[in-house]
């Protein structure tokens, strides 16, 4: 824990004890100003903001913090549908093999540089590992190389038109271009300097950075922002937002309850404190997201010495974990257990082949697993290590899972704890995941676009003609997003056939067949689907949350996404 965070934690504790209201809020009796513009607020989050460049993998509310600065071509509306944002429209051709995006004209990055087709091409080309792209640095190699493996070329047709050609047809390509809110556009000036790229985020978004370290971000209103409200007032409305990392949910909850923080985000894993805040309706307002972060634990099959090389070991773990009980004990029933690696509304949903909790079966498979290991010369038996974030809630949640595995006869090492940013970097690294499991994946959303990449044998199929596949980066990152690190090419055959299918009924059937195979072989264990929750102190008088109209005129409910609130249209009554 850094000294900066210790100081913040101490400050929160003192403020909670000394005050019932944050210094950034207005007195309850104050009259609202005629203008919506102005105001400064503070927001508490769980996850460390590890950085702003291509290689910085962020999750949940840390991702949401960076989205104050960054924007993407594609967004989602209140119903989860993909809608235009920096792009004003798109069209697919050649059966989903070519995608053409028309960009909005006249947009600038916060430093004054033009947002245009050349900039979009630069961002996508660097993200996919094209070393000849302007500004490319070896430091920019990232999971994007695997995620973008199906992209063969990116062409700037004119200033506002970008054409993306794929190796294989993909009728869910918009899901990949959204990428759970991660597919953001960075300014050329940020990309130009690899020494500062991770600390100097420059985007087209409503705010720009004033100061930044991994545990505290201060942003101010971007005067060059391109959006106006229906009255012609330039957005955003707020002048400044301070985002602080408060690891302990107890402190974060107390801070937003007392008004030390104007708003704070929470995960389903922090259910004890979410439930408590839900019961304080006179003090805070809740903005809850959909349970669209798909619960998937993925056994790492090719980690050196991993018992998960053997299907019996994978199925032993799958049958051992009592997810419904875990949901009741640790998540207070707030998780959603669909019995599948995706939710019931998803095109890939099926319970076929999925193991469900059965201790007797788990013990049978543990015996078979140990026999497999003994035959392979392993004398230590079935042994695993789980990991947890440094927060108390994360550790206690992991202990509950470990208890179920031990009950089935699996030997468990001490839980490994590290910052979430460290864990993410160790899972999504060149050469593959360092841990026995990927205890969850970034997979989310209504389509297969940001689900499929995590289950194929590698980012690039064996017969790929993509020139990046044979480069050191293509080889090094081929297994990064394929979290199971497996070699079952039947998964590829099933998923790619479904991806290319244009008949809606057949497409769903093909995706379900792929899911059934993944579940039956223990390649991914169905767990609990979770959401993000944001609570706002009522004395902060924040208005307009969830009411902002998108550029296409649709109401956007950003609380539905894992990244939390959309702050562009939020204003403070004064």
Which residue stretches match the model-derived regions?
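N-terminal lobe/hinge region of extracytoplasmic solute-binding protein
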Residues: 44-94, 125, 202
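Gly/Pro-rich hinge or "lid" segments in bacterial periplasmic/extracellular proteins
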Residues: 178-236, 240, 565-574
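Extracellular/periplasmic solute-recognition and catalytic clefts
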Residues: 46, 130-139, 210-220, 242-305, ...
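Extracytoplasmic/peripheral linker and loop segments enriched in polar/acidic and small residues
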Residues: 34, 315, 327, 411-423, ...
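Aromatic- and charge-enriched surface segment that lines or borders ligand/interaction sites
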Residues: 88-135, 157, 163, 252-255, ...
